[in-house]
Amino acid sequence: MDRFRTAFVNTVELGLITGVLSSAIGLLFAYVDVYVKLKYKWIEKLFNIVSLLPVVSPPFVLSLSTIMLFGRSGIISRYVFHIYDSNVYGLKGIVVVQTLTFFPVCYLMLKGLLKNIDPSIEEAARDIGASRLKVFLTITLPLMLPGIGNAFLVTFIESVADFANPMLIGGDFDTLATTIYLQVTGSYDSTGAAAMSVILLSLTLILFFIQKYYLEKKTTATLTGKASRVRMPITDKSVTVPLTVFCTVVAAFVVLMYVMIPFGALFK
């Protein structure tokens, strides 16, 4: 019972952290894509690649890449920074891997919603003297809240149901998915595993119905139809440069982790 309770708390904690981080990073990517005029076309192509990678690759790829790059015998940790006691296992490792895996889903969901916000509403606020930050906090963000909640729940469900990443990089951090597996293969307790599976299934189904029949309707009611005019992109460098640099670095890092996997076979 104690093991189940620990696994349940760990699973909820992991889902909450991953959901918040994935939604936040996905929102930043969507905002840059929709509101900022990207100076270089390759940045836009990089964003498109990042959005497709989680769809076409196995879910455990980033865990494997993280171990190869930053583990105790990692290419970067050992051969570049000469760190021989690097520990990527546990909650922090799973959070990083799941966030990098799932935030593109939030990015794609929120990108479509941002495009449907009528720019005339935001421009009217700007015309009466509201700052760019105030427009975002008082107009854009409130309109996006149902969509952000939707993206958060989808990511939460993905995180809770994920088995491969916690199994590879979780270490002694048990989740419901890994505990159920070990209950069957290690303890040969199929009855206990079935009971835990019912709890996990119930949790994901409850979240799914909230996302499907409550938040999805709110999102549709908030953002309907098409924008009445073309959105003028943000040109203020104090806004565009930090956001673009952050998103480009994150996207390049994700692509690097996928690209480096074949090279991992060359190192012991």
What would you call each of these model-derived segments?
Residues M1-K115, L143-F163, A195-K212, S238-F267:
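Membrane-water interface segments at the C-terminal ends of transmembrane alpha-helices
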Residues K45-N48, F81, P119-D127, T138, ...:
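Short amphipathic alpha-helical coupling elements at transmembrane boundaries
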Residues I128-A130, P142:
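Glycine/proline-centered hinge or cleavage motifs at structural transition points of membrane proteins
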Residues K134, G171-A177, I206-V241, K268:
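Feature of multi-pass inner-membrane transport and sensor proteins
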Residues T178-L203:
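Helix-loop-helix hairpin linking two adjacent transmembrane segments in secondary transporters
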Residues M68, D162-S187:
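Glycine-rich helix-loop "coupling/hinge" segments at transmembrane-helix boundaries
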